């Protein structure tokens, strides 16, 4: 169903598995989001359908996101799980700079040019109830901008797309092997970093730390 309806950028597929469960009751399929929030350092960008509509330099991106989220008010419905849309995405490790003042001015090398935070505003989604074998089609609208008829038309369109036949065409396999990947840090440097972190923990300088390396490969 995901491949049929949402196999595109700024969509998602989530399961509601909790704890040690092997099977989750709900599956969530987020259809393509029109609005996307991206944060680079202290710059917040809001895109709508790929077009930049807002751009701000802020002191605290986390506070800005919280204020943005607070403008939405969604009623709780008994037949739906607690999650039925909203902000979906990721917060990168680099956001520690927003929380720990001592790290605020550290200059980092951005080799990948990816957002520190990326959040989709998920208005349209499917909730699959694996227990009752039902699919809930959800769309959120702003009553000041949209009408009930507009939302109903969108729901009917999604339902029609669900009923359409779909033939999956497998993607060609990438010609990349494990040995093709090259570390930007190197094994020896990585091992030395792990040993340094162990000493810092024993000395009480840090409680935990995360070391990582970028792996690169050229697709053939």
Task: Identify the meaning behind each predicted range.
Residues 1-216:
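Extended alpha-helical targeting/anchoring segments
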């Amino acid at each position: 169903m995901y491949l049929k309806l949402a196999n595109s950028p700024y969509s998602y597929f989530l399961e509601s598995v909790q704890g040690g469960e092997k099977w989750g009751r709900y599956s969530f399929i987020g259809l393509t989001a029109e609005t996307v929030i991206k944060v680079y350092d202290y710059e917040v960008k809001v895109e709508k359908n790929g077009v930049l509509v807002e751009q701000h330099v802020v002191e605290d991106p986390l506070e800005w996101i919280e204020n943005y989220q607070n403008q939405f008010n969604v009623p709780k419905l008994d037949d739906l799980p607690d999650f039925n849309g909203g902000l979906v995405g990721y917060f990168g490790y680099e956001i520690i700079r927003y929380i720990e003042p001592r790290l605020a001015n550290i200059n980092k090398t951005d080799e990948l040019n990816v957002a520190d935070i990326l959040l989709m505003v998920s208005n349209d989604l499917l909730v699959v109830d694996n227990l009752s074998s039902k699919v809930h089609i959800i769309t959120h609208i702003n009553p000041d901008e949209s009408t009930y008829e507009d939302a109903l038309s969108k729901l009917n369109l999604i339902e029609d797309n669900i009923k359409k036949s779909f033939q999956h065409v497998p993607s060609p396999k990438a010609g990349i092997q494990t040995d093709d990947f090259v570390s930007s840090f190197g094994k020896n440097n990585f091992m030395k970093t792990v040993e340094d972190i162990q000493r810092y923990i024993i000395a009480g300088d840090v409680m935990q730390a995360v070391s990582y390396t970028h792996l690169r490969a050229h697709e053939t």
